Amino acid sequence: EVPTSLEGIDAIADDLVNKGGAGEALSMGIYGWFFEQFICKQGLAYANNDNGRSAAATAVDFDGNGAALSIVSAWKDLYDKGYAPNVGVGGDAGLTDFSAGKAAITLGSTASLKQILNDVNGSFEVGTAYFPGIKDTDQGGVSIGGASLWAIQNQDDVKAQATWKFVEYLVSAESQAYWATQTGYF
């Protein structure tokens, strides 16, 4: 059974490393998007004012609501036990060890899946799962990532019509099929 949290990964990490032959239980780069997702998975806010929904965000909330402490504590615990070494900075930093078979688990966006499958090249089976929480009891979801698209409202009707035409093309079945197969995003 695939763990749904860092707590769950910790529970099986010894077996992954000592019985399963993985050098690392978890290979995860230091990356802001992961930090944001761990906050969301806890159901907590990144910024004040309802994450900027009730009023403009003016300060971070994660330093006062316990989210950051939970993330760093759980990750440091895995690091201190030798289960999750520091593999560097960036969203793809953890992929190298995973693709080489040195790590049992890595974190990433679906956008990384094509790269992982190409790198693994059939040398082992790759499975996917939902982004983990910190604790097994975390019930939050994840937030959107960098592949979101925004259209700015303005007073230029010609630009607005052109923008809408572009959006219609992007959401067409043909465009979405190409996007999903080429990037991993869905």
Name what the model sees in each region.
Residues 104-109, 127:
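Paired acidic/hydrophobic, glycine-rich loop segments that form the ligand-binding mouth/hinge
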Residues 45-70, 118-120, 133-141:
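Short, solvent-exposed loop/beta-turn-alpha elements that line the ligand-binding surface or hinge
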Residues 7-60, 103:
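Extracytoplasmic/periplasmic solute-binding protein
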Residues 91, 108-113, 131, 146-148:
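Beta->alpha turn/N-cap motifs
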Residues 12-14, 56-88, 131:
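Glycine-centered hinge/linker elements that transmit conformational signals in sensory
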Residues 81, 118-185:
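Extracytoplasmic/periplasmic substrate-recognition and gating elements
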Residues 4-10, 86-100:
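Short helix-initiation/N-cap motifs at beta->coil->alpha
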Residues 1-2, 19, 45-47, 68, ...:
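Short helix-loop capping/hinge motifs at secondary-structure junctions, enriched
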